[in-house]
């Protein structure tokens, strides 16, 4: 009798599960059709480092070189990261530690490094002088922060003449020495002459954002910790910022994109959407930090809500920024435009988490997500629609 009861209970449970499965709607499958796709270089992997700002901005620069020169290059991220850390250390000590000193930074940081120090190919400075084949910076970040904090405390009451040399020595041990010269296609270059060879000019690029706490059509310093160089961005209404992005892709340009990615709609499966249902921000940086440790992270509830997205307003953008639900989490590289089977627009995004996910390292970010969660973008000034360039006084 007891055995019969167990079997009966099991049968009832199985029947209930079967009924529930029949009632649960199948998660939709997205079918993307590419509208416009501009050239990009290969997918890279920032791995265990907070250097998305460098990977994404250099990816953008590589696409610009492809567009203007036809050269397909792999530029050294760690050349840029090392130079950036040094500049930040100097400023941090000058300000007695009253500055953000961490792994994160901004697109403008990359442009300043290229302008001030030049650039080298990846093979000239891989930056893996610590026993791994991918970036792992937790130890380095902790060491450098501890070092600059100790220096800033001035235990000798006056700074020594050795502290910056000591900082440089730490960076060199992890990244290797900066090459003074190197050879590409049989020709010798310095970092500065190679920058001239590839034709990069930081004055050709425009930083754009959209917030209401500063006047539109004027530049302001975006108040985020990673903007430690205090670079300015031109402030446009949201619709005009989006117009710049669509125009850039249509005219053959790509876009450096800084965005919040803590939303539930930013998934492991290569999607970035804003479901109508209220979403909760996730804790965490980079792939594990933003979308979970494993592919087993449940996404069914997100997928089920995807077909209907929020209608984003300028006020919603501002509220997210003011309440810190929209922050400068992650830098990526937008290079194309696609539509799903319902005709919804998606920007095609090159990420820096390696060849991973459903689309092999590419994400599809919906118009709604980009409107809501963009912190800033960088584009070539010629990508601006003429009427917007005129409003900004850009020629």
Question: For each predicted feature, which ranges?
Answer:
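Short N-terminal helix-initiation segments at or just after the protein's N-terminus
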Residues: 22-26, 295-297
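Bacterial Sec-dependent N-terminal signal peptides
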Residues: 1-23
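Short amphipathic alpha-helical segments with coiled-coil-like heptad repeat character
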Residues: 2, 60, 122, 342-343
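Active-site signature of cysteine proteases
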Residues: 165-395
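Active-site nucleophile-adjacent alpha helix/oxyanion-hole segment immediately C-terminal to the catalytic cysteine
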Residues: 27-256, 357-359
């Amino acid at each position: 009798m007891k055995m019969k009861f167990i079997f009966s209970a099991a049968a009832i449970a199985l029947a209930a599960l079967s009924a529930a499965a029949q009632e649960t709607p199948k998660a939709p499958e997205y079918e993307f059709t590419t509208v416009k796709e501009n050239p990009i270089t290969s997918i890279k992997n920032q791995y265990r480092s907070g250097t998305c700002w460098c990977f994404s901005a250099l990816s953008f620069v590589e696409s610009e070189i492809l567009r203007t020169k036809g050269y397909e290059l792999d530029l050294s991220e760690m050349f840029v990261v090392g130079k950036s850390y040094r500049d930040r250390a100097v400023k941090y000590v000058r300000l007695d530690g009253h500055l953000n000193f961490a792994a994160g930074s901004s697109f403008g940081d990359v442009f300043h490094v290229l302008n001030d120090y030049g650039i080298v190919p990846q093979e000239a400075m891989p930056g893996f002088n610590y026993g791994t084949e991918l970036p792992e910076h937790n130890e380095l970040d902790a060491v450098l922060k501890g070092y600059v904090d100790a220096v800033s405390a001035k235990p000798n009451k006056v700074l020594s003449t050795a502290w910056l040399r000591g900082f440089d020595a730490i960076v060199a041990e992890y990244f290797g020495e900066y090459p003074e010269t190197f050879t590409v296609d049989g020709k010798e270059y310095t970092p500065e002459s190679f920058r001239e060879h590839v034709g990069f000019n930081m004055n050709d690029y425009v930083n754009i954002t959209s917030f209401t706490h500063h006047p539109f059509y004027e530049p302001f310093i975006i108040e985020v910790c990673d903007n430690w160089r205090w670079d300015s961005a031109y402030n446009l209404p949201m619709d005009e910022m989006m117009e710049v992005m669509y125009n850039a892709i249509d005219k053959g340009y790509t876009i450096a994109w800084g965005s919040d990615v803590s939303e539930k709609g930013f998934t492991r499966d290569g999607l970035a959407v804003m479901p109508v249902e209220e979403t909760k921000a996730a804790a965490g940086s980079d792939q594990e930090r933003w979308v979970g440790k494993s592919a087993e992270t449940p996404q069914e509830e997100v997928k089920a809500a995807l077909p209907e997205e929020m209608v984003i307003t300028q006020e919603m953008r501002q509220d997210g920024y003011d309440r810190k639900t929209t922050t400068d989490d992650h830098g990526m590289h937008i290079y194309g435009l696609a539509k799903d089977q319902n005709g919804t627009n998606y920007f095609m995004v090159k990420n820096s988490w390696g060849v991973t996910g459903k689309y092999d390292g590419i994400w599809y970010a919906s118009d709604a997500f980009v409107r809501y969660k963009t912190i800033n973008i960088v584009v070539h000034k010629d990508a601006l629609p003429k009427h917007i360039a005129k409003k900004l006084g850009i020629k």
